[in-house]
Amino acid sequence: MGGYFDGDYRFSANFRQQWWAAGAPFVTSTAGYDTKLMPTKIPEHDIFSVGVMGLYDQSLSGGFKSVDVSANVSYNRSLNEDGQNNFAIGFQAGYASRAINYSDLDFATQFNGSGFDTNLPSYETFGSMRRSYLDINAGLLYAYKTDNTEVYVGASMFHIGNPNISFLKDQRYRLPSRYTVHAGSRFVVGDNGNELFLGGLYMYQAGATEKNFGIAYGLSVSDEATVYAGSWYRIGDAILPYVGLRYNGFQVGFSYDVINTALKNYGTKKNGSFELSMNLLVTRPRNVYTNYKGGRIF
């Protein structure tokens, strides 16, 4: 949910390469920005946030590409005067474009006995195809916060309108809605600002499910810096160790998927995925918001 951060602006970026050792990895990049609006015109502890996000994804050695651009808006309502209990609702609307270029793909007729030869004819005449559509998502979040404890639980629904994503004009294939439920907590441990994080995620789409849970610990090495380490487990699939560093408003994290299913035997045992994430929080000088009383909600 947008707006849940210390500061006034947040810039974020993420890069993920999946199954890189298999020869044709899935590559996903995202970039986002969100900010809080009208802090002096809404009730204390409430947060009104807007943002934008872009996503670029490619697979099949670049033969399939997708681009998503979206805008989001959310509002957090404090349920009591001290801002400990909060309820938020958010919406996201975006434009998505999918393209597949058959000239970048290999077909059975191009196999020469030892590998694929792109100079051999594929006998396919599809060429390049594209499909664009509008997409809508929504989510809810409840958060409880004190000085030393934060707990949240949320749910969201993606692809609410089930847009048609078929590349063929005379056929229709509706993108199934995806449902998620997530929960987590943060606890301050001891007097030096160390932190313990717990979290879990459940996703469902068209009969497929994914269940993750994990734990991380943040070691405060100074007033400006914290070092993080932890691990997630994607049930029945992979272990995801994680390390990270926060310095003032900048945070970077790195995780790697250690595959523990039969997929690890495809070509090489080094078939995991890695992910790099970055966040930058920017705070305006306080004299800009002369009556600003808000703070971090989550």
Where are these regions (language model features)?
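Subset of outer-membrane beta-barrel
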Residues: M1-F298
